[in-house]
Amino acid sequence: MAKCDICSKDVLFGLKVSHSNRKTNRTWKPNIRRIKIIENGTSKTANVCTRCLRSNKVTRAI
């Protein structure tokens, strides 16, 4: 699974707990978008999570 190139957000692992308290493994995956960004004056493609896109931690290349 892809990881955010800006904040290094990655997959989290945990347990799904039913009403009868049975536990099974589950994962939480980040919302990753592959977009073009401007870095050091040049454009490149990067894997960026939507949290970083919303908070303007990266400038998009149009």
From Swiss-Prot:
Pfam family for this entry, one: Ribosomal_L28
Biological process, per Gene Ontology: translation
Keyword Ribosomal protein: yes
Keyword Ribonucleoprotein among record annotations: yes
UniProt keywords, alphabetically: Ribonucleoprotein, Ribosomal protein
Positions in coiled-coil regions: none
Single GO MF annotation: structural constituent of ribosome
GO cellular component: ribonucleoprotein complex; ribosome
Classification via NCBIfam families: L28
Family to which the UniProt record says this protein belongs: Belongs to the bacterial ribosomal protein bL28 family.
Name by which UniProt lists this protein: Large ribosomal subunit protein bL28
The species this protein was found in: Acetivibrio thermocellus (strain ATCC 27405 / DSM 1237 / JCM 9322 / NBRC 103400 / NCIMB 10682 / NRRL B-4536 / VPI 7372)
Recorded name of the encoding gene: rpmB
